[in-house]
Curated annotation (Swiss-Prot):
Family under the similarity heading: Belongs to the XPG/RAD2 endonuclease family. FEN1 subfamily.
Top-level taxon of the source organism: Archaea
Role noted for this protein: Structure-specific nuclease with 5'-flap endonuclease and 5'-3' exonuclease activities involved in DNA replication and repair. During DNA replication, cleaves the 5'-overhanging flap structure that is generated by displacement synthesis when DNA polymerase encounters the 5'-end of a downstream Okazaki fragment. Binds the unpaired 3'-DNA end and kinks the DNA to facilitate 5' cleavage specificity. Cleaves one nucleotide into the double-stranded DNA from the junction in flap DNA, leaving a nick for ligation. Also involved in the base excision repair (BER) pathway.
Residue span of region I-domain: 117-256
HAMAP family referenced in this protein's UniProt entry, alphabetically: Fen (MF_00614)
Protein name (Swiss-Prot/TrEMBL): Flap endonuclease 1
NCBIfam families with a match to the protein in the record: fen_arch (TIGR03674)
Underlying gene: fen
A Pfam family that the UniProt record links to this protein: XPG_I
Residues bound to Mg(2+) 2: 174, 176, 235
Gene3D superfamilies associated with the record: 5' to 3' exonuclease, C-terminal subdomain (1.10.150.20), 5'-nuclease (3.40.50.1010)
Organism per entry: Methanosphaerula palustris (strain ATCC BAA-1556 / DSM 19958 / E1-9c)
């Protein structure tokens, strides 16, 4: 879910066209997979599956979104979460319970014929399993796209790569990337121009947020941004009741973070969270290698193993590796 900073970041969001985003993008892989599993579903909430009952929603999302990236001159690198920090355990347990309850409500809605509620609850029950991650990595490898297994938080790894210049920007729907120090965050980088938010469909377009512009505009340091995040609540702590983004900013700008914690949460030590955002476990000096797609391998996986329509897969691949004279992938590899 990430830190709830949207309210104070609105004026720093800049609409972008796909054409202006050519470059190398570090994609929050787990975040992307969750989106695919949530959105790519049948009207009653059932995920897309092959004849054997194996979920294919994530593979469809990975395949077509990645092709769209490449077609638009974006070289993606998918970053996957490693071992979650102990700080996150409470959040993980809470999310697991939310998914479990959503699954129960999904079944109940189906039983009473309430398709709209069933779809809503099905989305909330989405779960990224080890098999889903493994098959996504397999597909990306066949597509010639590098995958990075982060030692801990994928967003932290993506932010580090953006800060070092290994990639042009980080891609995630969450704002944690800014707390981790990503100089440029891009959101809404999706194939569809629509998203479902709180039960309704809205039009969206890619947008970028520059960390230096945010800090300068708000008149704070990155350290104070992290402090504000902790006051509001992060994946590692619940925050202080009644403290939203605007109040949190006022507090940190007056150097009141420590006093507020001492007053409201006397038994809470924010030091481990501060340190984790400042210096999370990441892999430095990565060597990224893009390769031409293995069309036969892609067809074997998607069509042979998962039942995708062969013609649809071939047509999609043709868009980026088409006949002579057309734009091809060669310039990227």
């Amino acid at each position: 879910m990430g830190v709830a900073l949207r309210e104070v970041l609105t004026e720093y969001k800049h609409p972008r066209t796909w054409e202006t985003l050519a470059g190398t993008a570090a994609i929050d892989g787990n975040n992307a997979l969750y989106q695919f599993l949530s959105i790519i579903r049948q009207p009653d909430g059932t995920p897309l599956m092959n004849s054997e009952g194996r979920i294919t929603s994530h593979l469809s999302g990975v395949f077509f979104r990645t092709l769209r990236f490449l077609e638009k001159g974006i070289r993606p690198v998918y970053i996957f979460d490693g071992k979650p920090p102990a700080l996150k355990q409470e959040t993980i347990e809470s999310r697991r319970e939310v998914r479990r309850e959503a699954g129960v409500q999904w079944e109940a809605a189906l039983a009473r014929g309430d398709q709209e509620e069933a779809y809503k609850q099905a989305r909330a029950s989405s779960r990224v399993t080890p098999e889903i991650i493994a098959t996504s990595k397999e597909l990306l490898t066949l597509m010639g796209v590098p995958c990075v297994q982060a030692p801990s938080e994928g967003e932290a790894q993506a932010a580090s790569m953006a800060a070092s210049g290994a990639v042009t920007y980080a891609v995630s729907q969450d704002y944690d990337s800014l707390l981790f120090g990503a100089p440029l965050l891009v959101r809404n980088l999706t194939v569809s121009s629509k998203r479902r938010v709180q039960g309704r469909t809205i039009a969206v377009q890619p947008e970028s947020i520059r960390l230096d512009e945010v800090l300068g505009g708000l008149g704070i340091t990155r350290e104070q941004l992290i402090e504000a995040g902790i006051l509001i609540g992060t994946d590692f702590n619940p925050g202080i009741r009644g403290v939203g983004p605007k109040t949190a900013l006022k507090i940190v700008k007056k150097d009141g973070f420590a006093d507020m914690i001492a007053e409201k949460l006397p038994d809470f030590d924010p030091s481990p969270i501060l340190q984790f955002f400042r210096s999370p476990p990441v892999i430095a000096n990565l060597s990224l290698d893009w390769q031409p797609p293995d069309q036969a391998g892609i067809e074997d996986l998607l069509c042979g193993e998962y039942g995708f329509a062969t013609e649809r897969v071939r047509t999609a691949l043709q868009k980026i590796s088409g006949p002579p004279g057309q734009k091809t992938l060669d310039r990227w590899f």
